[in-house]
Amino acid sequence: MKFTNSEKLHQEALQHIVGGVNSPSRAYKAVGGGSPVYMERGQGAYFWDVDDNKYIDYLAAYGPIITGHAHPHIAKAIAHAATTGVLYGTPTCLENEFAQMLKEAIPSLEKVRFNNSGTEAVMTTIRVARAYTGRTKIIKFAGCYHGHFDAVLVEAGSGPSTLGTPDSAGVPASTASDVITVPFNDIEAYKAALNKWGDQVAAVLVEPIVGNFGIVEPFKGFLQEVNELTHRAGALVIYDEVITAFRFTYGSAQQIYGVEPDMTAMGKIIGGGLPIGAYGGRKDIMEQVAPLGPAYQAGTMSGNPASMAAGIACLEVLKEEGVYEELDRLGKRLEEGILEQAREHGIHITVNRLCGALTVYFGVDQITNYAEADASDGEAFAKFFQLMLREGINLAPSKYEAWFLTTEHKDSDIENTIDAVGRSFAEMAKTL
């Protein structure tokens, strides 16, 4: 493959855009550097770049594009919105319709509010939790990403449960000190944190299925015990389902495990490819939000007709019979095929998968928390990424990210991908 036009465009971008990209995850820093590939169009499960190279896409825009690129039902809804006005600044019937769809799909949502991104949604749930409880501290789990706002850009210290330290320049230490970080799936560390700071904790922020250091499920009973301990301490449980809502089932991850949080933040898939965020939960908590309560949240673009129309159309596609069963079937075959190729070529990997999302980790035997994911072989992944790119397989350029299947992937795509994995592993095996 040649990437001449991508390389030229990246040099041009570096003159105008900070780092040449509008989100750091799009750079190839974690996979050896160089110019990222510039895509020109997408259709179904495929991308074509500016050099006319074709790819099977497993990035899915980091998760939102579960129905594939340019899905006709969603495209029609967006086109209609474009001709009737994309932004009014007034309430619309689409907001009512979409809110009702979300409530019917996720029973814990007694009231809903739309905004414009997952970051905004999580940020506001924290504000609401603090308003409701009168407390300030938040507990999060190490390695779980909840957006780029100050309150959650923190990392763990050296102990099993520690006050946070800033994970980004520009985040005040005073802000980070209100965030307590504990390892995911470690209920004893969580108990220790509550024992030490419980009367100061407003809420715990949980990815019920981790999506930001790969796909990692909770241990059996972990979420239930977190709920029980949190409520006993007088704090709230917030689920960050920005990645997980409508990814594994028609609804949310909380329904898979039979646990209800007090509030839920959403984004990505529910926008049908357009910018969106939403949060919701118990009525008495949500009524802390203005104009009913003292917790302020607003947005010029919130609930705009284009995003509402795209979101409604996306959920209509996902509600069709057999969607998630097919994603699971294809995901299982892809997982099995990758593991078969690894055994054949002597490549040490483990694969975490749920339904149509999976992560391939190099050089490790299991991944149940961030420390284990962090210990996986980044150099091996970088080599694998570059080889797969040249095989026409588009993956996220990070060892921590997931492969996302869409409703448009076919059996032939999976088999072609497994073959590409085999050729890539064969090349990697030469240097073992």
Curated annotation (Swiss-Prot):
Keyword Cytoplasm attached: yes
GO terms, biological process: protoporphyrinogen IX biosynthetic process
Main location, first listed in the record: cytoplasm
Alphabetized InterPro entries for the sequence: 4pyrrol_synth_GluAld_NH2Trfase, Aminotrans_3, PyrdxlP-dep_Trfase, PyrdxlP-dep_Trfase_major, PyrdxlP-dep_Trfase_small
Disulfide bonds: none
This protein's UniProt keywords: Cytoplasm, Isomerase, Porphyrin biosynthesis, Pyridoxal phosphate
Domain of life: Bacteria
Cofactor(s) it depends on: pyridoxal 5'-phosphate
One cellular component term from this protein's GO annotations in UniProt: cytoplasm
Pfam families: Aminotran_3 (PF00202)
Reaction(s) the record says it catalyses: (S)-4-amino-5-oxopentanoate = 5-aminolevulinate
Family assignment from sequence similarity: Belongs to the class-III pyridoxal-phosphate-dependent aminotransferase family. HemL subfamily.
Subunit (UniProt): Homodimer.
NCBIfam families documented for this protein: hemL, PRK00062.1, PRK12389.1
Protein name (database record): Glutamate-1-semialdehyde 2,1-aminomutase 1
Species: Oceanobacillus iheyensis (strain DSM 14371 / CIP 107618 / JCM 11309 / KCTC 3954 / HTE831)
